[in-house]
């Protein structure tokens, strides 16, 4: 975490940068307004209280899971309730988990899916060709999958029951797919030709599967969508019109989604 003293130092550094000519422009002042709002939110009693998971019932904590992933997902929901508008849940194993069976090394590991080797074993995944690199390659599927299924389903179910999904868009996303075939190291490498994402809330219909791949899961056979379409879908859900553009210094216009089209089945 970030202590109060370090947080204050960063605020002072930001204040010193705000004396620049760029900061005094209309765009810079608008950005400063957003920053001040974010700082007020971070230091508000509601946001501070959101980090206290002991305020939740035993049943809710059990439903999310008492492991680190469950705590992160539950915290995400509490931050939304506290008024935080954009929340990213990035699950990183904390150092206090070191030494537990099936877990990683000195600094903890990302509970991620970058599994190039040993994804079906019981211990931590190694690096390519057996060289241990757990800080990158994380934990194997037998450790990852049960906690993910439990925590993500709990998040969607809990937010729905609380009415939070009515005006909150939940996106479960990765940067790429994985190779349809297991490599010689017992893992799967990067694959950009097919991947899956999940949406919930903000008017998205539940229980729908959009698109399809071949029997190997390697190539899209129905309803091919691009990252630009994904981005445009989010902007449209947020009420940002397709014609909206950002402007760089010097007046250069930047398209938000580079011509992407919203995924029509989600509207």
Positions of PLM-derived features:
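Ligand-binding pockets and gating/stacking loops
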Residues: 1-267
